[in-house]
């Protein structure tokens, strides 16, 4: 067996993988939780995906080194705010290490739980945490959506592509 065929050795390095994944457009989200002391935590995430329809499940990837990791991994519930094109500023702030991520005043507290969310987002999912799975240098947090709030469906989404924010441009007329 050659070194390249060794299953214990990664086939590509982290930078090559990062460069390749920069070609994959992903929706921009802000994920928020409350910690055990009631403090708000939030971070911008591009690694949020639908995992299952029955039962409904979403997955949020969070780096083990993230300042929000401990709170996110321990939270009983979390909110995923799917951002629109007009929410670049909050996306940038929530992605900035050391920033006061809640300084802009855009966040509200979910009734009955207090978990912060962005009421002007395209969609907000309030999720109950069902599992946390270690995957390399990240934890994958699985959650069941228990409530969904939708905003303006005509608002274009905010996407992350090639290490920058983008908004899709329709190539065909919208269907009525």
Curated annotation (Swiss-Prot):
Q: Which UniProt keywords apply?
A: Oxidoreductase
Q: Which Gene3D superfamilies match?
A: Electron Transport, Fmn-binding Protein, Chain A (2.30.110.10)
InterPro entries named among the record's database cross-references: Flavin_Rdtase-like_dom, NADH-dep_flavin_reductase, Split_barrel_FMN-bd
**Gene Ontology biological process terms in this record:** pyrimidine nucleobase catabolic process
The record's GO molecular-function terms, alphabetically, read:
FMN binding; riboflavin reductase (NADPH) activity
The record's listing under Pfam families reads: Flavin_Reduct
| Cited function | Provides the reduced form of flavin mononucleotide for the PIIA synthase reaction.
Q: Which PANTHER family match?
A: FLAVIN REDUCTASE (PTHR30466), FMN REDUCTASE (NADH) RUTF (PTHR30466:SF1)
The protein in question is named NADH:riboflavin 5'-phosphate oxidoreductase
Native source organism of the sequence: Streptomyces pristinaespiralis
Q: Which gene encodes it?
A: snaC
């Amino acid at each position: 067996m050659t070194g390249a065929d060794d299953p214990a050795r990664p086939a590509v390095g982290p930078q090559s993988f990062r460069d390749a994944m920069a070609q994959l457009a992903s929706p921009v989200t802000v994920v928020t939780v409350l910690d055990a002391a009631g403090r708000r935590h939030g971070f911008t995430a591009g690694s949020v995906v639908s995992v299952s329809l029955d039962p409904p499940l979403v997955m949020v990837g969070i780096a083990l080194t993230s300042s929000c990791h401990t709170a996110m991994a321990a939270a009983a519930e979390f909110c995923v705010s799917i951002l629109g094109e007009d929410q670049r500023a909050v996306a940038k702030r929530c992605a900035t290490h050391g920033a006061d991520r809640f300084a802009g005043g855009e966040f509200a507290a979910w009734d009955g739980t207090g978990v912060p969310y962005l009421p002007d987002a395209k969609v907000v999912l309030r999720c109950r945490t069902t599992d946390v799975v270690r995957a390399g240098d990240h934890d994958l947090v699985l959650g069941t959506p228990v409530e969904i709030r939708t905003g303006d469906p005509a608002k274009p989404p905010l996407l992350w592509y090639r290490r920058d924010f983008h908004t899709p441009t329709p190539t065909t007329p919208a269907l009525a």
